Structure formats: structure tokens, C-alpha cells
Amino acid sequence: IDVDSEEFETKVDNYKNSLLIFEYQQRLIDQNFDTSVSTNDIINYYNTHIKEFKLEQDIFKGRLIIVDKDAPNLSELIKLFKSNDDSDIDEMISYCLLYAKEYYVNDSAWSYFNPVKSKIPNTMSARNIYYSNRKYDIVAQDNFIYLLFLKEYKFKGEISPFSIEKEKIKNLIINKNKMKYLQKLENVLIQNGRISNDINIYL
């Protein structure tokens, strides 16, 4: 291969300089860049760009219990499952710990529905359940009984709630702030004539 040695050395030097500058920037970021983002900043960003936050899949607040059809006291479990009383919910959780094959009972937090959908019979329709008066369905199939309650439900394409987007927005703001910081840093270094061999980095 015919390679111009001078051109090759120039490229190597440029590559080394790029690595040195990158390492220098990373160390300054580690030492000086503030990664904190206030909750107000996150809320303001969400409210300002709310139309951009569309759900890519269905989400829900609810409960799912999968239990063997031969599990004890199923009638009591169903009674507890339908209840919103705190003591009943605690009792339901205790039951699930002992007998449920799988369960999810945190109906105060949004969760993605796809993992649930993959575990329930095809006859259980989220749309039908959610728009029904009782908002739950109980289905026996094969060796198991499936109990599904949908307290709240949002479909793909709807506006995503703040709790789902909070961490994404925080990281987005951090990355934007980091880019601004790096641009400011680069401008200062250029002004000081320091983007050269003047920068001593001890690796």
C-alpha cells in the first residue's frame, strides 16, 4: 500500500490531539460540570414540549395476578382483588407471596402493558376491560386463573405522563447542558490559545 508518510504522521498527530482534547474535556466535566437538574426545570421542559411526548406503547395502572387454579381460598383472593381497602391489599399481597405464580399489584404507578399482555390469555382485552364498568376481568385457562384490573390506561400515541418521561427529560437536559459547557470550554481554550501542545495531560 502506497501511503504518504508525512500525511500519515499528520493524521496520527491529529488523532492524538483529538484524544488529548477529549480526555482533557472529560476530566474538566468530571471535576466541574454540574449534573444536577431541578424538578422545576424538568416539569417546565415537559410542559413546554408536552406534544412531543407520545407513548410508543400502551401503559397502565392496575393489578395482575396469575395463580394456579388449585390454589387455596380462591374466592377470598377474588374478594381481596376487587377491594381498594389498604388492609385487604396487604392481605392480597401476603396471599400472592405464598401462592401466586406471578403478580403485580402496584396500581399507583404507570407501567408498560406489553409485559403483561404477553402473560395473559388472548381473550383478555385491555380495551374491553378498561371501558367496562368494573374495569377488571377474571379468566380461567388451562391450569391457571388470571386476574387483571385496569385502574387507568393510556394507549399508544396518547400523551405520555410526566412520571414516564421524567428520567428521559433529566438526561436530555444534562446532555444539552453538557454540550453548552463543552462549547463554552472550547471557546475559552481557543481564545487562550491552549488547544495545542500547551495542554499537558498526564495519562
Where are these regions (language model features)?
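Peptidyl-prolyl cis-trans isomerase
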Residues: I1-L203
